[in-house]
A protein has these predicted regions:
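Helix-loop-strand module that forms the ligand-binding subsite of alpha/beta enzymes
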Residues: 1-67
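Glycine-rich phosphate/pyrophosphate-binding loop and the adjoining helix
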Residues: 67-114
Length: 114
């Protein structure tokens, strides 16, 4: 694949346990990365990993979900990482529609680059 797109809800500062379990299954030496004398080397052919999420609160650049997916992209050898987050949907219900529309527009623009 040229790109990997992961979409998940933002729950309790991260993403669902089922997705974490999936990551454990695919994070395997010889499958998504390997080791050389120089250290860990990614084994994925994808050029881009995109993390899409939405949630009731606001996710930031330094939140667990974003950091984890950014680090996994690097570990797997995927050079480009982006994320789109529609956050604060419960915290600011009056602007939830605008927030979703902005995130969808950002995701659509990003999809054109894949």
């Amino acid at each position: 694949a040229d790109a990997v797109v992961v979409a998940a809800p933002f729950w309790d500062l991260s993403y669902p346990a089922a997705l974490r379990t999936y990551i454990e299954y695919i994070s395997a030496v010889g499958l998504t990365y390997h080791y050389t004398d120089a250290g860990c080397c990614g084994g994925c052919a994808a050029e881009h990993l995109v993390y899409l999420a939405s949630g009731g609160d606001v996710e930031r650049e330094d939140s667990v979900g974003v950091i984890h997916w950014r680090q996994l992209a690097a570990m797997f050898g995927i050079p480009q990482f982006d994320y789109v987050f529609a956050g604060g949907l419960d915290a600011s219900p009056d602007t939830a529609g605008e927030t979703l529309a902005a995130a969808c527009a950002l995701a659509e623009n990003l999809a054109r680059t894949l």
